[in-house]
Amino acid sequence: MKIGKFGEVNNLSIDTIRHYIDLSLIIPEKKGAHYFFDEYCQSDLELIIHYKDLGFSLNEIKELFFYKNLAKSMNYEKDIFYQSLFKLKYDKMEQEIELLEKKRDKLKGVLHDLLLTNETSNTIIGIELSVLHLLTCSKCSKKLILQDGIINNNQIIEGKLICNCGEEYMITSGIISAGKLFKANEQTLLENIISDYIHETDNAYLENMHREGEWAKKKLIHLDLNNKLILDIGSGLGFFLRSIYEELPEDCLYIAVDRDLNKLLFLKDVLARRNPKRNILFICADFLNIPIQNRSVDIVIDHSGTSNYSFEHENFLLHELNPLFKSNCYLLSLFILFKNFSSNSQITINFRANFTLSKIKKELQNLQFQSIDESTSNYLKRGGKYEDFLVQGEEIYTYSFFGKRWG
């Protein structure tokens, strides 16, 4: 029979059969351009399947076939070396089973620990009373007054901060909301968003995220973070904060700012399960309405916050936030840059300059940040469901910057 019929009878693909032919495990007769398979081919195939069921690899099966074909009629099954092939396979399988059992037991222990972790009660994360003096009105820069506060363990959980100018900042679940309150969407299940993000995002994009995130982490943890105020603009789901959380000193204040209350609630809930506890202040606000003192920020974390802002604004975000920064502050940034823009690009022409390296470097120079280290990624052609700003024909890359102003 021909190869198609032979494959159909044995429920094998033509590619698999051709592979067996290439290894000389099956040797059909060839007439012209076609192979023809007889009962000997069928017998060899059944033996291949039998040996595979015993755990032999195709190369090991080739060696067994040499015995079958070259020692025919010599009662080769009794040959000591032939038998040793089966004995070696058996011993190897025993070792693999033993190793798998050890791995299974370790995995069982990890699963047990994970279940215990899930049962751990959450610690309370609110606004520490000790940071109130740092909070000021984003409109007039005057001090804020706590009103109707619910306090637990020296942390404000609910209430509002008011200013004499009339501005109010609600405190909900330990999160300050400035300006319009971005209400939590009860139907948004962010618990599954991390796994969904991984599955829906291009591997090269994820690899770059990990590589640049590790680069930034190493820069930050080598700084003296004691008694420092860190401002993270666009904390999102907290990819960066969660990676450095345990590295933060107890007396370091980390301010996570995002427009999306859902993401802040998710991040807060995740960190509430972590030990030891760190001083994190969550603010839900537009970037231009962050209610903190001018010239109070020691370290700026801008992990694509400026780039995300630039999708909708022409002004350079770091320039807008500059009054908040100390004269000698550090900047740790990651910018999304475009190698090219397609004719149907989603980036409005007026906003494109902020996605070019020359503009970024010029703005950083204008802000008097001097480079300590920089990193530029390879080009990326795809993002994914959550990084859908790319269109066909466009390529992006990331530029990471670590620098300082010297006052």
Region annotations inferred by a language model:
Residues 40-117:
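Arg/Lys-rich, alpha-helical DNA-contact motif
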Residues 208-227, 243:
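Conserved alpha-helix/loop element of class I SAM-dependent methyltransferases that forms part
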Residues 226-238:
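Conserved class I S-adenosyl-L-methionine
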Residues 231, 242-288:
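Class I SAM-dependent methyltransferase SAM/SAH-binding core
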Residues 288-300:
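A short acidic, Gly/Pro-enriched loop at the edge of an enzyme's catalytic core
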Residues 315-329:
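A short glycine-rich, Lys/Arg-flanked "PGG" loop and its adjoining helix->strand segment in the class I
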Residues 328-336:
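Conserved beta-strand signature within the Rossmann-like core of class I S-adenosyl-L-methionine
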